């Protein structure tokens, strides 16, 4: 009896059903159902594996499904929903159901999901029963039902439990963490490890409903997680506490305490020394701005370009021609590494997979370098502190770039506290009475982060965003680190379109292509939500095909993230335009 109780409690927990008292109707009807299965199977206990029945009710959900699918495959039965007992002699799945209404209607109801199973219906009060298909020996069922009557009498369980129909209350099931989920799904299909089967099980199928506001995701989807990399600065041993308040003023105060600047004599370091020694900075509307009068040519500030001569234009055109031929290849093929990985996933043992997953987090370090670009062209030189975890780890600045800077080389430069490689060990300065080492780092501004966006959302880049990622692995990539975690895909969608996060990585070609598609889909979704008219050049179908094509060339974790985002939006658009 205790074992049965334990079994039911465990099962309810696995299915995320609410805890109910052991005297409640819901619990007692589960108990009666379970005992019916046990009593029925007990009649044919023989030695070894030769027993006629397998009781699926006593197995975990995944094991049971795995066993039933294997059984169906072996006997060529059409797959139905999970049954209660496997009958190896009749090669059928048996389902038991108790009903307070008509036995015939109960049987028809079960038929919808289990057309091929033998359905045994028992009335409340345990007076009569019916068996579909007419192949199962009625005597077996009768013995089972009698055993249940005795069981109820002995344990003081009422014969009639669900007078008022079903007592089940629907509960939203939250999906478990991604790796657990994948492991569980692999385990349940492990019986015949066909690649397609496993992949189909792992594929995320979000269900969406259209609402008045265009299209919003169902609440159940809140827990559907995807991989997310959070760009952050990594911690270097030398830092200053950040006391809160406007970061421009904080930086100005920090810089005003600077003296005894030493450099390794390189041009750029000398310019930084000139700025700090002359206290050439001021705060304007919250931003700290460098006011050095001379041109900082070594930081890419140039004279205004003169117009090119005809000859120069012509040679440039010839050079450009090769790259615009129609058949220029857009993506490489899947790397051998990836193919090996795929093969490994479907052939490796459980321990191998676990070891691999832990090593995998370390490997993700090489996925891409996170870039915190300020913005594109500026007419002023902005300088900002890099803040994370309440400490200032350095500062980043962007020099003026004039119009006509067609190569968009307005790089960001970071001054990082701490020793860098090579000779920069000679760079020192005293700040707030403490001597620190510093080194310069060029940060390419490939992103299209706007200055306003970064100011408005300092917490995204300049400080750790506590709301965003609660857990995850931080991988260090000096001077930046990435936090790799899983967050809800709808949150990811919102953040991605708000911050253009995809642009924060140096991309693989597939990622570039997927990001471009992502922009288009985001625009369409906005249009739908705001009830604006929208159309696409070509057809939606072509866009979807293109995304599918890109999907064949994914290599890095970031590629997968952007691709996932595209797929989610396509589904969103499809649902809201039906």
Swiss-Prot record:
Top-level taxon: Viruses
Keywords, ordered alphabetically: Phosphoprotein
Keyword Phosphoprotein carried by entry: yes
Mod. after translation: Phosphorylated on serines and threonines by host kinases.
Quaternary structure note: The RNA polymerase is composed of three subunits: PB1, PB2 and PA.
Function: Implicated in endonuclease cleavage of capped RNA primers. Displays an elongation factor activity in viral RNA synthesis. Dispensable for viral transcription, but not replication.
Name this polypeptide is given: Polymerase acidic protein
Species assigned in the record: Infectious salmon anemia virus (isolate Atlantic salmon/Norway/810/9/99)
Taxonomic classification: Viruses, Riboviria, Orthornavirae, Negarnaviricota, Polyploviricotina
